[in-house]
Amino acid sequence: MNRKTGTTTVGIRVKDGVILAADTQASLDHMVETLNIRKIIPITDRIAITTAGSVGDVQMIARILEAEARYYQFTWGRPMTTRAMANLLSNILNENKWFPYLVQIIIGGYVDEPTIANLDPLGGLIFDDYTATGSGTPFAIAILEEGYRKNLGIEKAKELAIKAVKAAGARDVYTGSKKIQVVTITKDGMKEEFVTL
């Protein structure tokens, strides 16, 4: 079975926090399944992941990470950092490389510091200031490269993330162009909102 799906998710790290954004359309081949799917999944109150790929695989990964985060908190009395969770996820994905999870994930959070990482299905891990996943990546990255500055404030970073997903939605048929899910993570916690275009 060779069916095309797609999405666009982005992550941006600035000094005051992390922005994750994603379209809310789920597609299969030429059909739109729904316009209201959440592609950003909270793992803790300070860490979330974005989804590009198999829904079932990413749901399984989210359950594993939630359990590991609770176990870490219980064992050590402090929350797992985003960097530690990204490394754990990299190991999980690499362990399964012969029967891989069909996902590309952005993990973002603010535990000790704002952190963004991109993981491929085989566990390849890249920490960066901004990243994108999914079929709309070329369009989103072009916007991020043009607009990103290390001194961006959290509100400007949110505007840039929305602009990147919106640009992908205008050019990539598998990326939704009607609504964007946005999650902001700062030292004060996590906030989710939806932007209608």
From Swiss-Prot:
Q: Which cysteines are joined by disulfide bonds?
A: none
Q: How is this protein's activity controlled?
A: The formation of the proteasomal ATPase PAN-20S proteasome complex, via the docking of the C-termini of PAN into the intersubunit pockets in the alpha-rings, triggers opening of the gate for substrate entry. Interconversion between the open-gate and close-gate conformations leads to a dynamic regulation of the 20S proteasome proteolysis activity.
Which one GO biological process term can you cite for this protein? proteasomal protein catabolic process
The record, for CDD domains, names: proteasome_beta_archeal
**What function does this protein fulfil?**
Component of the proteasome core, a large protease complex with broad specificity involved in protein degradation.
Q: How does it assemble?
A: The 20S proteasome core is composed of 14 alpha and 14 beta subunits that assemble into four stacked heptameric rings, resulting in a barrel-shaped structure. The two inner rings, each composed of seven catalytic beta subunits, are sandwiched by two outer rings, each composed of seven alpha subunits. The catalytic chamber with the active sites is on the inside of the barrel. Has a gated structure, the ends of the cylinder being occluded by the N-termini of the alpha-subunits. Is capped at one or both ends by the proteasome regulatory ATPase, PAN.
Please give the name of this protein. Proteasome subunit beta 1
The organism encoding this protein is Pyrococcus abyssi (strain GE5 / Orsay)
| Gene name of the encoded protein | psmB1
